[in-house]
Amino acid sequence: MKNLKSNDVLLHTLTRVVTFIILAFSVYLFFAGHNNPGGGFIGGLMTASALLLMYLGFDMRSIKKAIPFDFTKMIAFGLLIAIFTGFGGLLVGDPYLTQYFEYYQIPILGETELTTALPFDLGIYLVVIGIALTIILTIAEDDM
């Protein structure tokens, strides 16, 4: 990655705004994915692209300081969540990865569906973010 001048005000401002929009859309896709197109995979790709945009708009060192994640550990954590989510069905005699859902009344949101697919999607979300950023940042660090 190249070193940017400290007076790139337009680039930094647009990066912040566009990153916020991408992250908000990523969260929407993550939660809408149960019944509509989206879910953990595409939400993870959108989040990874937003973080990559931050790496491109600012210098890599300051972003690593602001976001101190080890993305390889994020991959492992996401895999553990996705794998262990499936064991819930086995505990009650159903097949692996059986999905359960229930509707609950939540004061502000009204009737809301809570499902066991959400933690599985969270695991996929973390795996996709971790893999995408590990690959991209490894390539970027080799070019430096």
Curated annotation (Swiss-Prot):
GO terms for molecular function: antiporter activity. The keyword ATP-binding does not apply. One of its GO terms (biological process) is sodium ion transport. GO terms for cellular component: plasma membrane. It comes from the Bacteria. NCBIfam families: PRK12573.1. Mrp-dependent antiport apparently occurs by a secondary, proton motive force-dependent mechanism, but the similarity of several Mrp proteins to membrane-embedded subunits of energy-coupled NADH dehydrogenase complexes raises the possibility that there is a capacity for electron transport that could provide a primary energy coupling option for Mrp functions. Mnh complex is a Na(+)Li(+)/H(+) antiporter involved in Na(+) and/or Li(+) excretion and Na(+) resistance. Na(+)/H(+) antiport consumes a transmembrane electrical potential, and is thus inferred to be electrogenic. Does not transport K(+), Ca(2+) or Mg(2+). This is Na(+)/H(+) antiporter subunit B. The gene is mrpB.
